[in-house]
Amino acid sequence: MSGMNEKSIRFLWVGRPEYWIALALFAVTLALFWPATGYDYINLDDHLYIPENPMVSGGFSWGGVHQAFTTVYEQWWLPMLWISYMADIEMFGEGPFGHHLVNVLLHAVNAGLLFWALFRMTGARWRSFFVAALFAWHPLRVESVAWITERKDVLSGAFFMLALLVYVRAAEPPPARRMGWVFALMSLGLMAKSSLVVLPFLLLLLDYWPLGRGGDPWGSGSWGRWRPLVAEKIPLFALSAIFIVLTLITHGTAGGE
């Protein structure tokens, strides 16, 4: 039995080192941002989003979930964001620690997911690591992780990374019908932050490079190759359009207001 375990460990280390790279990215990112778990709320929307938010302050409840999906709060319709705060309070109690902890964990997970998505797309192990590490450890990421209000960034980022991974899998031969999962993950991400409206455009860019699904978009017969790639994303474009309109309405800027 021990021999089998040794062989398995040796295979993972020698044959699939990317597992260890993803784990290392997670661990180092967690260590770098761990001090944020000791921070307090700050007077930049934290109190407005959590202690003073009646949807969130009581913890998780089905009534709160219903309210999250039916209420525009402070010009935002972000039900997944409010539900995530409810879950924090339910698991860790009142106070900022749980919110900070979940932010840090989400960011560390996102670092590993980004590496894995890049590696699956390119096969370039160390370049994928470098890009993921730059994303995870850049000082500009501190605001999104250490500021509880910016949960929307790391939470939508998690759905974004998962959507990328599922899409890469869907693009591999033999053809896999996983676009429904991409749609679902994009929907959840948009309910945390509306910036995910760019996802279908990004997927088209990935079709060109590095996935190489459509070939040269300017070459002979290119539309015949690209038409099905655009068509499969029509539901995603429609979803983006819906959330763009919804965001304009909730911010009071639609219809000339």
Ranges and model annotations:
Residues 1-257:
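Polytopic membrane enzymes that build or remodel cell-surface glycoconjugates and lipids
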